[in-house]
């Protein structure tokens, strides 16, 4: 090979390397899918409920202002009663699954479609509306 061909090959390899690096940078700097993040947040909040972490479930609900402690306690009791009702009617919720999620980033909202798998082998698809506030997804 002569020097001209080596120069052309070297330039071609440099160009391929530069394009590869640019693609890598673009792929690494992309933001996570908002619908996917909202879906994972919804699942986590409902998993807290299944684990008996009622306070964490209630804290996952969006409220623009703080609430009195007595009202928070009522919400926690409501969550416990809901789980008791599910236990009586379906032998409890055993698992939650994400089916789909759609996000409207302009409005900072998402709809997460989940399936509740009950202890009596039945399932129920549930729509979980979510809202984003300061980069965190909350149950609406």
Across the structure, where does each feature detected by a protein language model lie?
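A general boundary/transition motif marking the beginning of the first structured unit of a protein
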Residues: 1, 33, 45-46, 67-70
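Sterically constrained small-residue positions within well-ordered secondary structures
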Residues: 6, 12, 89, 103-105, ...
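Short, low-complexity N-terminal intrinsically disordered segments enriched in polar/charged residues
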Residues: 27-51
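Short solvent-exposed beta->alpha transition segments
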Residues: 39-40, 54-105
